[in-house]
Design a protein with these regions (language model features):
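Residues in the helix-turn-helix
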Residues: 18, 29, 58
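Alpha-helical and His/Cys-centered functional microenvironments
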Residues: 20, 31-32, 47
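Recognition helix of helix-turn-helix/homeodomain-like DNA-binding domains
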Residues: 25-38
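Residues in the recognition helix of alpha-helical DNA-binding motifs
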Residues: 8, 22-23, 33, 62
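Short, charged recognition helix plus adjacent turn
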Residues: 50, 60-66
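Long, hydrophobic alpha-helical segments
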Residues: 42-45
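Short basic helix-loop element that most often maps to the first helix and adjoining turn
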Residues: 3-22
Length: 66
C-alpha cells in the first residue's frame, strides 16, 4: 500500500516521533507505514485521516491503482 504519510508529516514539520505521539503508536510503526512494510489497520487509517483532515483514499492507495 502506498501512503502520502511522509509527505504530509514533512509539510507540517513533524518528526516520525511527533506523528507517532499524535496517533498513539510507536515511531517504528510510522516508519513501517511510510516505507510500505506495514499496512495500517482500518482504525489507524481513520485516525490518520482525521488528524490530517483528509479522506483516507487521499492518504492511502493500493499500489496496483493507476
Amino acid at each position: 500500500m502506498k501512503s502520502k504519510l511522509r509527505v504530509l508529516r514533512a509539510e507540517r514539520g513533524w518528526s516520525q516521533a511527533d506523528l507517532a505521539e499524535r496517533l498513539t503508536v510507536s515511531r517504528q510503526a510510522i516508519n513501517a507505514i511510510e516505507t510500505g512494510k506495514y499496512t495500517p489497520s482500518l482504525q489507524l487509517a481513520f485516525k490518520v485521516a482525521r488528524l490530517f483532515a483528509m479522506p483516507i483514499e487521499t492518504i492511502f492507495s493500493d499500489e496496483d491503482e493507476l
